[in-house]
C-alpha cells in the first residue's frame, strides 16, 4: 500500500495528468490517498510522479494520520477508536491501519473518505521542483522519507 500526496498544483498541468489524479482521488494540493500496489495503480503513479510524493508508510505514521485527518464519508464525526469500533469491521485505529497496509480493505469500504486532507508541512517542503534524488520532495520515498513528510503534514 502506497500513500500518495499531491505537492504541486494544477497550473500548467496536462489534462491527462489531472484526470489521473482525480482517478486516484486526489483533487487538491496537500491531499493524500492510499492506493494498493497493483499494475494498474503502478502505471497511474508513474504518470503523476512529477506532481506527487509517494511511498509505503509505517503503521505508526498511518495511525497518526488516520487519527488526525480521517473523515467519515457521511457526516462530520471525529474518527477515533470509538468511531472505528462502532462503524467499521475493526476494533481500533491500529487494527484499521494494519488492515490498510496489508491491503485487506480500503478507506471507502470502511465508510471513510478515500482522501485525507493534510496540513501543509510544518517547517516547509524540501523543494517541490526537484525529485528526492536531487534533494527535493517529488517522487518515490523510502518508508522513513514518507513518514517524515506525513508526520510534518499530520
Swiss-Prot record:
GO molecular function ontology, one term from the record: structural constituent of ribosome
Coiled-coil stretches noted in the UniProt entry, renumbered to this chain: none
Transmembrane stretches, start-end: none
Gene Ontology CC, one term: cytosolic large ribosomal subunit
Keywords for the protein's UniProt record, in alphabetical order: Ribonucleoprotein, Ribosomal protein, RNA-binding, rRNA-binding
Gene Ontology BP annotations: maturation of LSU-rRNA from tricistronic rRNA transcript (SSU-rRNA, 5.8S rRNA, LSU-rRNA); translation
Residue ranges with Basic and acidic residues bias: 123-144
Pfam family, one: Ribosomal_L30
PROSITE patterns cross-referenced by the UniProt entry: RIBOSOMAL_L30
Gene3D superfamilies found in the cross-reference section: 1.10.15.30, Ribosomal protein L30, ferredoxin-like fold domain
Domain of life: Archaea
UniProt KW Ribonucleoprotein keyword: yes
Stored SUPFAM superfamilies: Ribosomal protein L30p/L7e
InterPro entries noted in UniProt: Ribo_uL30_ferredoxin-like_sf, Ribosomal_uL30, Ribosomal_uL30_arc, Ribosomal_uL30_CS, Ribosomal_uL30_euk_arc, Ribosomal_uL30_ferredoxin-like
Region (Disordered): 114-146
Subunit: Part of the 50S ribosomal subunit. Binds 5S rRNA.
UniProt family annotation: Belongs to the universal ribosomal protein uL30 family.
Entry function: This is one of 5 proteins that mediate the attachment of the 5S rRNA onto the large ribosomal subunit, stabilizing the orientation of adjacent RNA domains.
Protein name from the UniProt record: Large ribosomal subunit protein uL30
Origin species: Haloarcula marismortui (strain ATCC 43049 / DSM 3752 / JCM 8966 / VKM B-1809) (Halobacterium marismortui)
Source lineage: Archaea, Methanobacteriati, Methanobacteriota, Stenosarchaea group, Halobacteria
Amino acid at each position: 500500500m502506497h500513500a500518495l500526496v499531491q505537492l504541486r498544483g494544477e497550473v500548467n498541468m496536462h489534462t491527462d495528468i489531472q484526470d489521473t489524479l482525480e482517478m486516484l482521488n486526489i483533487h487538491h494540493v496537500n491531499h493524500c490517498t492510499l492506493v494498493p500496489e497493483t499494475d494498474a495503480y503502478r502505471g497511474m503513479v508513474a504518470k503523476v510522479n512529477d506532481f506527487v510524493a509517494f511511498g509505503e508508510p509505517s503503521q505508526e505514521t498511518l495511525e497518526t494520520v488516520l487519527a488526525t485527518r480521517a473523515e467519515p464519508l457521511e457526516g462530520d464525526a471525529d474518527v477515533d477508536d470509538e468511531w472505528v469500533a462502532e462503524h467499521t469491521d475493526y476494533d481500533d485505529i491500529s487494527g484499521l491501519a494494519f488492515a490498510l497496509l496489508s491491503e485487506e480493505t480500503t478507506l471507502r469500504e470502511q465508510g471513510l473518505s478515500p482522501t485525507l486532507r493534510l496540513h501543509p508541512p510544518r517547517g516547509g517542503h524540501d523543494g517541490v521542483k526537484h525529485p528526492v534524488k536531487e534533494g527535493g520532495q517529488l517522487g518515490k520515498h523510502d518508508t522513513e522519507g514518507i513518514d517524515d513528510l506525513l508526520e510534518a503534514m499530520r
